[in-house]
C-alpha cells in the first residue's frame, strides 16, 4: 500500500505539471509584456527568462501545444484507473481525443487572428484561444486517461475457449499401401491450417459415428471405398439405401479395372433381395462354408440372433434355454441338409464320382472318402462337396413340416441325432408347450424369410461366386444391398451371407488379398461376433469400417455387451456431430481426454486490477463442442503404429517433440477437391443386371415356379427317407 500511495502522489505531480504548462503558455503568449511592468520588473524578468526556453524561443505556439500533449501522454502512461468491463472505445477515447485535438488546432488559429473586441483589456480572440486551449487539453487528457480503463488481457475475447481447445494436428501425409488419407483443415493459433487424417493401419478397425446429415458417409465411408479400391483391395460394401453406395463402388471397380489396379481376375457381384435382376445367386449353406457341426451352430445362431435383433439381452435362465434349444434345432437341420446325399465337384463345378458303402445301422449309403474322376476313374481330390438339397430354401421349407416328420428325417443322420434328444423326449411325452417354446419360436421367425426372392438367390443351383472374396485365385467385389422398407427380413438374410463370408476371408495365413469390409448403418445389419473379426483378422489383412449414428442406437440392436465389445475393440475412431449423451461422454472423456490448459483470471477492485494465470486439466474437446459441429467437421483419433524410440545422450528425450508421443487426435473440417468429386459423380455408369427377364410377369412366374419346386423337393426327400427307413 505504501508503494501505491507514493506512485499515486507521483502521478498527481505529473498531472499538475500538465496544467502548469498550459498556464505558462498563457503567461507567455496571452498576456502583453507591457502589462507585467509591476513589482520592479520582476514579472517582466521572469517572462523574459521563460521566453528563452526551447518551446517558447521563436514565438511559435505550435511547439508549446506539442509539449503539452507530450506531457499528457507521459502522464497517462502511468495512470492506473479502475478497469471498465463495458469499455466503449469510441465514446471514451476516439470522440474526446478527436474533439480535444481539434480544439487545440482551433486555439492556434484563434491566437493568430486578431479581433478588435476586448474584454478586460484582452482581445476576444485571446480569450477564445484560452478557452479552446483549456477545453482541448482537458479532453485530450480524459481520452488518453480512459485508455487505462481498457482491460488489455482479452477478457471475454475467447468466449467459447477456442484457443485452449485447439491443438496442433498432423500436417504430414502418412501413406502406405493400405492407408486411407483424408485431406482436412484445422484451426490453431489464429490460422486455418492444412493437414491430413492418416488411417495408416486400417486393419485395426474403424468406426464412424454421427447424426444423420453430419457427413460421416461423405467424409469417411466414401474415401475408404475410393482409396481401398485404388490400392487393390477386394471390397465388401453394405448398402442400406441401395443404390447409394452401389453406384460409387461399381464406378471405382470399372475405373480401377481399366487402370490395372484391381486384383487380377476380380469380378463385381451384388446381392439384392428386392430387385433380383441386380443380384447374383449364392449358396452359403454348403460344405465348403459349413464343414462341421460347430460351423452349423454358428450359422444358426447368426440367423436367429439377426431375426431377434435387440431382444437378446434381459432374459432369464428359461429364455436362455429356449434360445439355445432353437439354435441347436436349426443347426441340426442345417447340418443334415449339408450332408444329405452330398456329391463331390472339381474346381470348375464338374461332378465327380464318390465311392459309397451302406451304413449298417441306418442302411443309408455313406461316402467312403474315395473320389474318382468320372471319365478316367482316377482318384482325385474334390474342390468341394454339395448336398442334394444343401441350401437355405430347402431348410426353410423343411421347417414347416410336422414335428414327427422332421424328427424321423433328422435322426437318420448319426451326427445330428444327439442334438435331437431333448426335442424327441418332449414330443414323446406330449409336452407340446415345451416343444413349441423350443422350436415354435424358431419356426415363426424363419417363416418370415421364406420369400420367392430369397428362395431364388439362395438356391443351390445358382451358386454364382465364392464368398471368399479375398481368394487370390478368384477375388471379387461384393455389394450387399438392403431396403429400408424390408430392413429386418433382408438384414437377416444378409447377416447369413456376411457370417459365412467373414469365416472364409479370415483364413489363409496372410496369403489373401487385402479385403475392406465397409458396413454403413451397422444397426440395420446383424454382424455376428464382429469384435472377434476385428481382433483376429489383422494377419489376414481384413479392414473393417463400421458406421452408425450413436451408441444407444447400437446398444438397442446389439445389446450393451455387444456395443461395448465393438467400440472397445476398434482402433480408429471418427465422429461427426453427435447428440446422445453416452456418445458425447465417450468421445469427450475416453477418446480426447483432458489436457493442461492455461486459464486467465481478472480481479478488479477500486484500487487495482489483478491478472492471474492458472494451469489446470480440462477436456480437450468438450461434449458441447462435438454436438455443435457443422456438416463436414469431424473429430476422433487414429490408431498408432509401432515407432522406434529415439533418445539422446544418456537416454535424454524431449518428450514434447518425440514422434512417439505426438497426438493422433484430430478436430477438423474435411477438405476434398469438390470439382473432382462432381466430375466423378457425373461419370457414374448404370449398375449391371446379372439376370434378365422379359417382363415383370415372367420374373414373378420364374420365381414362383422355383418357390414351388423347393417345396416339392422337400416332399420327395421326406418320402425317400421314409421309404429307406421302412425298408430296414
Label each residue range with its predicted role.
Residues 1-214, 218, 223, 231, ...:
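Basic- and hydrophobic-enriched, low-structure N-terminal and domain-boundary segments
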